Amino acid sequence: NQHLAYDDLDLDLKSELSEKKAIHSNIGVLMLSGGDLKDAKRVEHPIFREHPETGKKALYVTEAFVKEIKDLDPKESQKKLEFLYSHASQEKYIYRHKWSKGDLIVWDNRSVQHFAEHGYGDNERTMHRLTTSGSKPY
């Protein structure tokens, strides 16, 4: 729950990073999937984003895509990102699902980071992904 992760951040850090942008890139995904690296893109998104329906702020950095914090010294950027990644992945912000036959999970990508832990053992699994359009994280 990245809303709670944001809420628990120190006020000074929130203030320091409130207007900062993170540079996101899909190059890691392309490398893993054998995609054409010419298709790599870099985009800027705020480190803290506001949910368009609830107005709640959330931490919006993920180790898989964020490469740096714009306008920060590279070492300082890396130090801050490592802290934010560690903070965001604390157990208290994690939901682990125990799979049962017929389960359906829906989540809001604007508020979470998700990661498959393969908790279904040797059981057959059928997965359907539905992606709806949404707002940019600004």
Task: Pin down the residues of each PLM region.
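Non-heme Fe(II) oxygenase catalytic core, chiefly the N-lobe of the double-stranded beta-helix
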Residues: 1-104, 109-138
